[in-house]
């Protein structure tokens, strides 16, 4: 079954709501790892609405599993990534007015820019993943620019209002996995996954890691980070 990358952005969201020092996302990362998280994910946004550069620097020194840095493919973010050197990077689209990431990257429509960013990062040994919708065009473009991974956007599946739509979206994700694998790409997934809907995605052939944040942090507010992470690990394995 896939491994679990715990996204701790929303621990920082709570902190930034009061512009104070707590809760500390670094402490949350430690607790998540102790509970069995296989990796820690953070999104350093251009508007710095939650995770701050200082957080990423400290996490780079303290995370014992692997650190996945989500970021927009901009010169500013590339410079930061080259300084910090996370274990791997997921390139994501970004709009300042969005509440959360609303869709996948348009890799096919920005091939030259994406190829340049991927080459810069992978040239210093940082594997790059492209956060994309499960569309053949975007998957093939990601292979064309020689990214190592893709992360399939699971939002449409997660937001499905009925079982028929959910099944349709799951089939699209499964097809995306197969296309990616046939093009030599490794496959992760994330966005909107919960304790209730994660298992079907976890069962997709070739799925390596699921990056999950909001639902874990939401549960952690009530039961603690360690229990929230342990229960997500169980959910991924169909035992929750």
From Swiss-Prot:
Pathway(s) per entry: Cofactor biosynthesis; pyridoxine 5'-phosphate biosynthesis; pyridoxine 5'-phosphate from D-erythrose 4-phosphate: step 5/5
Disulfide bonds: none
Binding residue positions for 1-deoxy-D-xylulose 5-phosphate: 9-10, 45, 50, 100
Localisation: Cytoplasm
Catalytic activity: 3-amino-2-oxopropyl phosphate + 1-deoxy-D-xylulose 5-phosphate = pyridoxine 5'-phosphate + phosphate + 2 H2O + H(+)
UniProt EC number: 2.6.99.2
Taxonomy, superkingdom: Bacteria
EC category name: transferase
Pfam families reported for this sequence: PdxJ
Residues of the site described as Transition state stabilizer: 151
Gene Ontology CC annotations of this record: cytosol
InterPro entries: Aldolase_TIM, PyrdxlP_synth_PdxJ, Pyridoxine-5'_phos_synth
Keyword Transferase recorded: yes
Keywords of this entry: Cytoplasm, Pyridoxine biosynthesis, Transferase
Keyword Mitochondrion on entry: no
Binding annotation for 3-amino-2-oxopropyl phosphate: 7, 18, 192, 213-214
GO biological process: pyridoxine biosynthetic process
Similarity comment text for this entry: Belongs to the PNP synthase family.
Subunit structure, as described in the record: Homooctamer; tetramer of dimers.
Stored HAMAP family: PdxJ
Role of this protein: Catalyzes the complicated ring closure reaction between the two acyclic compounds 1-deoxy-D-xylulose-5-phosphate (DXP) and 3-amino-2-oxopropyl phosphate (1-amino-acetone-3-phosphate or AAP) to form pyridoxine 5'-phosphate (PNP) and inorganic phosphate.
UniProt-listed PANTHER family: PYRIDOXINE 5'-PHOSPHATE SYNTHASE
Protein name according to UniProt: Pyridoxine 5'-phosphate synthase
Gene that encodes the chain: pdxJ
């Amino acid at each position: 079954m896939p491994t679990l990358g715990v996204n701790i952005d929303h621990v920082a969201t709570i902190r930034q709501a009061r512009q104070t020092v707590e809760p500390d996302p670094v402490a949350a990362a430690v607790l998540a790892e102790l509970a069995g998280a296989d990796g820690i994910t953070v999104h350093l946004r251009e508007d710095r609405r939650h995770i701050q550069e200082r957080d990423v620097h400290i996490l780079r020194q303290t995370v014992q599993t692997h650190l996945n840095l989500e970021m927009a493919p901009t010169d500013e973010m590339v410079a930061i990534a080259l300084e910090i050197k996370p274990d791997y990077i997921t390139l994501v689209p970004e709009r300042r007015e969005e509440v959360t990431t609303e869709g996948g990257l348009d890799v096919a429509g920005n091939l030259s820019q994406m190829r340049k960013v991927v080459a810069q990062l992978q040239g210093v040994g940082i594997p790059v993943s492209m956060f994309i919708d499960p569309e053949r065009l975007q998957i093939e473009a990601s292979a064309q620019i020689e990214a190592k991974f893709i992360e399939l956007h699971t939002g449409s599946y997660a937001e499905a209002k009925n079982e028929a739509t959910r099944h349709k979206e799951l089939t699209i994700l499964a097809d995306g996995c197969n296309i990616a694998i046939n093009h030599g790409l490794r496959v992760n997934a994330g966005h909107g996954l919960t304790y209730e809907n994660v298992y079907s995605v976890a069962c997709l052939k070739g799925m390596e890691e699921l990056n999950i944040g909001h639902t874990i942090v939401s549960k952690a507010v009530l039961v603690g980070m360690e229990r929230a992470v342990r229960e997500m690990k169980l959910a991924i394995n169909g035992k929750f």
